[in-house]
C-alpha cells in the first residue's frame, strides 16, 4: 500500500535541506529522479497498519553519486521528522573516520537550516546530534565498537558496507536491535567491493536475487546501479546506466578522463570498474587485463612435463587456508613455459570457522600446514 502523504513528507523534508560540498554548497537539495524514487518508495510504502513496509534498504551505487548527502538526509529525517519519540539513529562504518563522513555532512546541513539549528544540540566531541523536542539523537558508531549491545535502534545508516572487516557490527546493529520499534529502518549504502566472502557481498547477492525475482522478502528494498560482468566497460551508455547522477553532479569529462587513464594503465582498470561502474572485482588493482592473460592459455600434456626442471609457488591466505599452489616449468629451447595450478582453495563462509584439517579432509585433500 502506498501513502502519498508520508512519501511527500519525507521528500519535502529532504528538499528543504542544502548541499554541503564544493560548488553545490548552500544549494537546496532538490532530489534527483533516482533519489526521489528511493525516498518515496522507502517512506511511502506502508503495511495495512500504516507503518513502513521496508525495514531494510540496500543501495549500491558508484562513487560521487551523492551517497553521503542522501545518507545524511535520511539520518536527519529519522532523527527529527519520523514522529518517533526517543529515536536512536546510528551512523555506522568500518572505522570512526569513515562513519564521521556522513555525520559531518549532517552537521553542515543542520547549520544551514535555521529550523533544525534551533532544535538540535550538536555534541561534536561525541559525534552526536540531539533533537531536543523528541529526545532523539543521531550517533556515530564504528566496527571498533561492535560490542555495543542493548541499543534501542530506530535507524541505522551503514556507509560503505563493503569496507566492513567482518560481519560483527552489522549483526549487532541489524539483528534484533530494532525489535522494540514499530518501523525501524536499516539503510545500507555502499559502492561495490572486492571481497566476495564479505557481509556486503552476501547482502548484494540477496538484493540481486530479489531484483531478479529469484527471492522474495517484502521487508527488503534493493537498489543496485552498476554494469554486469558481460557489459562493455568502455561504452558511455553503460556509464550512464551505472551512474544516475552522471551529467548532474558528475561531469562526463571526469569519467572519460578516468577511463582513458585506465585503458592506458591496466593497473587502474579494476579501480575504474569498481568505483566508477560499481562492479564487484576480485581485486582493486589488476596487473594484467584478463583478456590478454587468457590469450596465453594453451593445452598442457602432463606426461611431457615429467623430468623437466620445475619450481613451486605457495600462496597462503591470511587465515588458515591455501589460496593457490602453482608449479612452473621454465621454457626449454623447444618447449614453452608451462604453469600448472595444482591447488586453489576458496573456503565457503559456512565452513570458515571449522578446523583446517576437517575442511581439507572433506575435500579429499591432506592438510600439510
Task: List the predicted regions and their residue ranges.
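Conserved beta-strand and immediately adjacent loop positions that scaffold enzyme active sites
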Residues: 88, 185, 324-326, 341
Amino acid at each position: 500500500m502506498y501513502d502519498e502523504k508520508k512519501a511527500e513528507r519525507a521528500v519535502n523534508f529532504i528538499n528543504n535541506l542544502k548541499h554541503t560540498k564544493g560548488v553545490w554548497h548552500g544549494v537546496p537539495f532538490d532530489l534527483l529522479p533516482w533519489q526521489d524514487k528511493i525516498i518515496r518508495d522507502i517512506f511511502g510504502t506502508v503495511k495495512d497498519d500504516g507503518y513502513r513496509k521496508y525495514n531494510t534498504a540496500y543501495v549500491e551505487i558508484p562513487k560521487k553519486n551523492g551517497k553521503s548527502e542522501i545518507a545524511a538526509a535520511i539520518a536527519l529525517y529519522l532523527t527529527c521528522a519520523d514522529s518517533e519519540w526517543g529515536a536512536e539513529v546510528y551512523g555506522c562504518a568500518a572505522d570512526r573516520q569513515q562513519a564521521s563522513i556522513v555525520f559531518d555532512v549532517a552537521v553542515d546541513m543542520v547549520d544551514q537550516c535555521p529550523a533544525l539549528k534551533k532544535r538540535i544540540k550538536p555534541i561534536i566531541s561525541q559525534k552526536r546530534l540531539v533533537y531536543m523536542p523528541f529526545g532523539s539523537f543521531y550517533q556515530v558508531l564504528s566496527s571498533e565498537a561492535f560490542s555495543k549491545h542493548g541499543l534501542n535502534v530506530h535507524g541505522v545508516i551503514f556507509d560503505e558496507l563493503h569496507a566492513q572487516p567482518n560481519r560483527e557490527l552489522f549483526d549487532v546493529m541489524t539483528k534484533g536491535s530494532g525489535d522494540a520499534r514499530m518501523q525501524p529502518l536499516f539503510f545500507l549504502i555502499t559502492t561495490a567491493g572486492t571481497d566476495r566472502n564479505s557481509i556486503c557481498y552476501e547482502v548484494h547477492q540477496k538484493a540481486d536475487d530479489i531484483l531478479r525475482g529469484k527471492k522474495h522478502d517484502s521487508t527488503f528494498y534493493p537498489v543496485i546501479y552498476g554494469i554486469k560482468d558481460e557489459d562493455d566497460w568502455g561504452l558511455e551508455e553503460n556509464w550512464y546506466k551505472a551512474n544516475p547522477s552522471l551529467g548532474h553532479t558528475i561531469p562526463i569529462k571526469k569519467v572519460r578522463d578516468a577511463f582513458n587513464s585506465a585503458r592506458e594503465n591496466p593497473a587502474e582498470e579494476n579501480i575504474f570498474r569498481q568505483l566508477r561502474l560499481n562492479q564487484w572485482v576480485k581485486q582493486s588493482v589488476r596487473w594484467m587485463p584478463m583478456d590478454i592473460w587468457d590469450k596465453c592459455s594453451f593445452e598442457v600434456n602432463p606426461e611431457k612435463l615429467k623430468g623437466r626442471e620445475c619450481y613451486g609457488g605457495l600462496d597462503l591466505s591470511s587465515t588458515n587456508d591455501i589460496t593457490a599452489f602453482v608449479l612452473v616449468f621454465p621454457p626449454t629451447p623447444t618447449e614453452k613455459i608451462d604453469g600448472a595450478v595444482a591447488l586453489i582453495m576458496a573456503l565457503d563462509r559456512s565452513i570458515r570457522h571449522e578446523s583446517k584439517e576437517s575442511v581439507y579432509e572433506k575435500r579429499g585433500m591432506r592438510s600439510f600446514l
